[in-house]
Structure formats: structure tokens, C-alpha cells
């Protein structure tokens, strides 16, 4: 029998695998630069294409999850994701990467949050923030461990063999997790009517609050996608070895564990609005330091601070959406928010790569991200307080 704690474990494995592998791609930048002579604009464009594809497919994935359940959606997406990463070993032209990231990687990314976190919201009507945080700790462990594993494989084999090993391993892990992530039986749902209540998609998607949540995601998400994509290669630019630079990604993952659990523990009490603002402060401090320092120790310290908030923000969004609109069409609404975020997330890494290619520095990129997070904070301040959720006031 599938228990809700097995669902949590399976969802965590999905997070560990998908996001950990995505983070590890940054470790391959130098190898691909040396092998093919491609610019960082090209290499970062791949992740940008994946994010955009993720957003488009997330809308579809949300609808399919609400209709058919998460298992089949996660299973198909997981196989495509793993095979896609393995296919990187066969590339010889930039368009090969674009196709792989646009289809295989993008489809895999589109389901890892929408299908898992919406399912968790149904299983845990109480303590939703903390359980979401526990699931997202899987992401943190992936961010922490898989870049180091990728660096180890590159050093002991080569980059192409590393992609094959990682990709095939991903297929098995994601198929396992797909078998465990299932919705509660109807009997379980009937015991808690909250799981059956909430705004319909057609109503919620037209509200001002929902549009603000989409805008907030669009404005802050470029930072969450750009820093993991470029921070390792930024470290090598500052004189770090490849292994030391890979530890920057692992540092984000390790710190994000603390961030996810800390915010998850208090999210249900603070509410989404305060939680957003709590997360934006350390991100702004970190971006400010990245603009001005070349000191390795300072980089590591503020990468850790950034990682705390990076992890926490991924915990904030799904429960906040449920706070305002309930669970009736949670996956479908979440898919729209993910889409809005990935539009910004797709733009961020490309512009950062272009800025580096033109200026030889990431300072302009860090400054732009800083401004976007400030704007996102302003929009958060206009959100209604938590007592204006759909359970207290229709038409949020």
C-alpha cells in the first residue's frame, strides 16, 4: 500500500535527480568550451531553452496531473529526461544541445515540481509548508552531491562518459519515484473536504492576486536560474580549480537544506507574503557582494547565504498558491506560475552569458538580477494578507 510517507520519499527522489543533474551541467561548461570552442552564450542558451520548454510543458503537465494522476506523467517525463542527458555524449553541433535541452530536458523539468508538489498538497492538508520543505530537501541534496559526482566522473573518465552514466542512472531513479508518487484514494479525500475545495481554474486564473503571483515569479526566477548556471564558471574565472568551483554549487545545495526546512517550518504561521520577503533579503545581499568581490572566501560565504534563500523560495510558492486558492485545480494553476517563472528563467542565463562575452565580467548580470528581485519585492508588498484567502473571501 502506498503511504503518504512513501509518496514524500518518491517526490524527494524526483527532486534530487532532476535538479541535481541540472546543476551538474554547469560543471561541464569548461569541458564543452575546450572540446568545441563554443561561447558561454551558446552553452547558457541551452539551459534557457530548457527553462522555456519547462514552462510550456508545465502547463500541459499540470492539466495531465489533475486528470490522470502524477505517476504516468512523472514516468514518461523521467525516461525522456535521463535519455536526453545521456544523448549529450553524442553532440557535435550547437543545435544538438538545443534540441536535447528543449525537448528531453525541458519535459523532465516540467513535471518535477508540478506533479510532485501538487500531490504532496493533497496528502498533507496540515503542515503543508514543512512537508513541502522536506520534499525539496531532495533538491538540495541533488544540488550538493551530483555536481561533485559529475566532476569526479569527468576527472576519472571524460565528459561524454560522465553524461551517459548520469543519464542512465537518472532513468532508473525517476522510474522508481514515479511508481511511488500517487494521489490519495477518494476515501481519503472525503475525510478532508479541503482537498476538494478551492477556486476553479477559470475563476482563479483571472484574479488580481493570481496575476501578481505570476509576475513575482517572473521577476525573481531569473536569479534562481542564472546563479546556478554561471556561478561555477565564475569561480574558475576568479582562479578556482574546477573541483573547488563545483563546491560552489554544492554549497548552494547544502545551504538550501537549511533554508527549505527553516522557511517550511514557519511558512504555515507566517503566510506566503512574509515568507517571500524573508527570502528576498539574503538574495539581495548576496547579489550585491557578487558584484564587487573577487575574494574566494567571501564568494563561498555569500553563495551559502544565497543558497539558503534559493532553497526557501522553492518551498514558498506551492503552499502560498494553496493558501489563496485552495486545492481544486492546484496543479493547473501551479503550472501557469511555473510557466511565468521559466520565461524569466530562460532569459536570465542567456543575458548573463552575453554580458560576459561582451564585457568579460558578470557584474552587469548580477546588477540586473538585483534590480529584478527589488521589483519582485515591491509586487509582494501589494499581495493581500493571508486572511484574504479563498476560504475567507472569494475572488482574491
Residue ranges and their predicted role:
Residues 96-110, 218, 298-311:
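Hydrophobic core of transmembrane alpha-helices in multi-pass small-molecule transporters
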Residues 182-199, 390-394:
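Flexible cytoplasmic inter-helical loops of multi-pass small-molecule transporters
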Residues 252-256, 262, 267-320:
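C-terminal transmembrane helical hairpin of 12-TM major facilitator-type secondary transporters
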Residues 163-179, 364-381:
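Symmetry-related core transmembrane helices of the 12-TM Major Facilitator Superfamily/SLC fold
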Residues 134, 138-182:
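Helix-loop-helix hairpin linking two adjacent transmembrane segments in secondary transporters
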Residues 25-29, 208-261:
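Extracytoplasmic gate region of multi-pass secondary transporters
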Residues 56-94, 267, 273:
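Conserved MFS/SLC helix-loop-helix module at the cytosolic interface between two early adjacent transmembrane helices
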